[in-house]
């Protein structure tokens, strides 16, 4: 239990403070006693399921809230603290499924902080305590902070005697764990015999067993293929794999391990955490390449921010950053509470996985007719945003995930990635859940649904011309930033144009009409909108005009400012380059990359229409699938009518070629990473494509150049590993102007010029 509690956080929880202590409190009421007892019971239940059954009954974020509430009550009413309180224990209870073994020294948990402000307070407090308790040590050598990734895996304790692995155990309750030696021996990275000489007589080595992100995806695919429910996350998969009764089954799972500390030791003298890491690596144990020894708070903050941005580029899942005082003398001086060390803390990133209720599964009809199921959930906050819907892709995915309507589900939202329903929490089913059944008819137009061709997983509505939902989606798409870039034509405007509540005849019944609109066409359009009462949605819908103001006796109805903006932007959109027009047409498989390639190769819509399928397929970045989709699209009369109508309304259907731009990058694949001074990302991509090159989003052995600006990320690391030529911005400009030969020559000259003459 944390020693002191003070300032109230915005979320109502109490954070630690060095100077504040709990205020005297009245005798706890019966309701508070009942809440305390339930918290103790629930947390112990959730812990047992998490540590011993590889089952997450609540999300990590929910567990943290419950645990902090328990700590808050105990701080205000210490007389309530019971011996079986989770705050008095380190981890989960020991399962009866494996032989219990006692650790030589206790394995502690870590204190968690959830904000930068809390972390700063902890560091200030730890620094002050270190100066007070280990003043001479700190004066001689200022504190350094070993900062490392908090792997989201299963804690394991390895015991070596004279370099020989004699036992491996789970953390358990921190004092007693479960003997899993035979299963751990199946992990290839773990040596049975340590390397080197003068090995300690006995040493405990702590680490984390995990499944790498890419291996987890493959494992779940394999499991689903056998008809079983997939694992909810890599941590559960690792825990379940280590608890297999037969080591041969564990050996089939892609387990890995990284070690991060030393427990008890006999015959080993080491001065710091970082020194011990170097020793562990020399012994042949797998250590993390990501740890750093830092000297100040700002460096720690930079480390946290860096991996907060790049956490999904890593080998494994992380849920935070661990910060430790590096030297052991200071650690020993600070010591431990009953549960956590006073010299280490875990900063937890905002949760990316939460639990919520799956209320229903509905379907959406997309712009190319694809019918996609999506989950409707109780709104929940995850990764900084509130989510209440998530795609389920197709009926096979729904089946593979094993989700039922009414399930409590694990919802994941990683960074900018779209929210994903990972799977159900099976232990919380009560028998009232029901299966999702894919509709056989389009919910928008009633047309029979079917795969586009035999063997397709996706089912589609073939009524592209007349399906109202498909038209709405296409109109919304053509206004997007990657197409005509019409900001005033958003989702609600697309509904108003194609599916208004009034009038019965929509202003836009085919996207051919979009550039032929006049303001008067929109005067009577009304949509249904949820009414607000004092700024709060009421659940009551009303009919409101969308494109015109309501109007009064004094002031007649007139176009809104957004409607005026819409017509200005429609006029501006007519001058967009050819590739954007191609994107706006919603041709299946034809995205920005293929559209740019087609526009560069042919120069005009007429030339693209006249090209044969082999001619289209020969274009770099197009290929046979896209070529076939183009031929199929242009074969429809009503598709060609859209192009003709847009052309008649002034939309540009040919690019003015700048013959002065040489095709210096023909056949080259280039990746841009980081920030450039003279180019934003789109401008750099445009410059590459205009010169005949391919602008790729990821580095591979087929990449010719990587252009690295400021804050270049993992793409730069990968380029260096693969031996791909890396250019700075000046080198990129040389490459654009003169091509690869001149760029290589410039590099060689620069290299020669940097040598010194004796």
Curated annotation (Swiss-Prot):
NAD(+) binds at residues 60-64, 109-110, 148, 171, 208, 324, 348. Signal peptide: none annotated. GO terms for cellular component: cytosol. Gene3D superfamilies: 5' to 3' exonuclease, C-terminal subdomain, 6.20.10.30, BRCT domain, DNA ligase/mRNA capping enzyme, Helix hairpin bin, Nucleic acid-binding proteins. PROSITE patterns: BRCT, DNA_LIGASE_N1, DNA_LIGASE_N2. Zn(2+) binds at residues 442, 445, 461, 467. CDD domains: BRCT_DNA_ligase_like, LIGANc. Its cofactor is Mg(2+); Mn(2+). Keywords: DNA damage, DNA repair, DNA replication, Ligase, Magnesium, Manganese, Metal-binding, NAD, Zinc. Its EC number is 6.5.1.2. SMART domains: BRCT, LIGANc. This is DNA ligase.
